Regions:
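Post-transcriptional modification and biogenesis factors for structured RNAs
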Residues: 1-189
Length: 189
């Protein structure tokens, strides 16, 4: 069988208005002092692609409108909801109060794989699954220690090469996809 590229019409994408009204996958991405505007834009675009609930932009993380962010977001900064917090700990506190399970994505002792975290989350009674927050940190320093201490669990992506880490927007894309796919199987989004 030969594959051919899809046209824009073949993709049946939502309009911005339909996206705003669509039921979102209950995943919020928290960016803890992410310095690269391009990384922030890429996370916006990926959150739009998977119809996630939104973003929390914290500390030095840039907010729209921003020309550099727009270069990678390609307009997703206009469709994906976001909230700015000067301090990431305030974002984590607010998410916990709303019933979210908060996961730091970090290279850490006692971390679990995305698959393990998803399995454990999905085993909980539906009433206890209010949503998931995925915390990604600064490109050099990672998730701040005080933020990690507030998280319910830490997720680490297993890596097998010579480098110590992945780019933050690549990591975000991997975990966002994993959670979106798993939660879509659980409920009709």
């Amino acid at each position: 069988m030969t594959s051919t590229k899809k046209t824009i019409a073949d993709m049946h994408r939502l309009t911005p208005e339909a996206f705003a009204a669509a039921r979102k996958v209950p995943v919020v991405v928290v960016l803890d002092n992410v310095r690269s505007q391009h990384n922030v834009g890429a996370v916006f675009r990926t959150a739009d692609a998977f119809c996630l609930q939104g973003l929390c932009l914290c500390g030095i993380t840039c907010c729209p409108p921003n020309a550099e962010l727009h270069k990678t977001a390609l307009g997703a900064e206009q469709t994906v909801d976001y909230t700015y917090y000067p301090d990431t700990t305030d974002a984590i506190r607010a998410l916990h109060e709303q019933g979210y399970k908060v996961y730091a994505i970090e290279l850490a002792h006692n971390a679990v794989t995305p698959e393990q975290a998803i399995e454990n989350y999905c085993k909980q009674p539906a009433a206890d699954r209010q949503g998931v927050a995925l915390v990604l940190g600064h490109e050099v320093f990672g998730v701040a220690d005080e933020v990690m201490a507030m998280c319910d669990c830490c997720i680490e992506l297993p890596q097998y090469g010579t480098k110590h880490s992945l780019n933050v927007s690549v990591t975000a894309g991997i975990v966002m996809y994993a959670w979106a796919q798993a939660l879509r199987k659980q409920t009709d989004y």
